[in-house]
Amino acid sequence: MKRLLCFASLPLLFLTLACTPQPSTVSLSHGLDASAGELDCYIISTETATYYLEKQGGGFSSILDVDGVDWLGFHKKPGSAHKGEYRGFPNSIHNQDGNYFHALNAGTELSTSVVEIETDDHIRIVFTSANKKWEGRWDFHLDRCDFTMTKVSPGYKYWILYEGVPGGEMDADDFWYSSANDQPQPIDQTYTEDLPSPEWIAFGDPDAPRMIYLLHHEDDDQPDGYINRADMTVFGFGRLEKEKYLDTPQTFSIGFVESTEYKKIEHFVEQSLE
């Protein structure tokens, strides 16, 4: 009889354990990004993404979704251009009193970093350029990452770029949404205007159940440009062709939305501003 009771209780015990939700946390570890060329990185794991933040350059080398797909595809190999070394986020300072906040490639100048906050729901890492003129703050939350340019070199400008590969590689049937239009735009469709407030854009792959989004927390009247470079996206807040327009401290978000429906993406992005 005792044996019968024991066996009868096992399914109940298994069900209880299986249905117990696991806590959602933001965790920080350290390691190499092999896909980027063995670069030393902060590795930040959240419930929706894994971010590889390269320690010397101060930019992302990889952003993995929950299926392990990398939506950046950076590699430091010299000469790889759009197929590797140009990719990343935020890639913000280029020939503007230095070249900073880009995963380390042949043209990236070095920065130093410090972890300022490390809790279960918030990690903050601050990078300072070698010339002390630029400072960028990374804040990682359960559902997104915020990048804030907290210090701008006087008289210089920057942009915030997503140069990546939706769904792991660029395909002709990839697409994007934005705050300017609720209809999906083909990946070849360019954009050269100021996005309406709240300024956001999201990129998707028809085979993926999610999209990667970028959000500008402050509204402005500066251009936001997108063009398809065949091997990667080139989207920039404060960018038109090769001109930079941002010159004050501002905040931007990047992350995944587990949907490809416009209204759900719009709602998720707007919640990030609350």
Task: Identify the residue ranges that each predicted region occupies.
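Bacterial N-terminal signal peptides that target proteins for export
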Residues: 1-8
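C-terminal motif of bacterial Sec signal peptides marking the signal peptidase cleavage site
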Residues: 16-18
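Bacterial lipoprotein signal-peptidase II cleavage site
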Residues: 20-24
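Beta-strand-rich recognition/accessory modules
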Residues: 26-47, 56, 202-274
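Acidic-aromatic substrate-binding/catalytic surfaces of carbohydrate-active enzymes
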Residues: 39-111, 121
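Acidic (Asp/Glu-rich), glycine- and aromatic
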Residues: 141-181
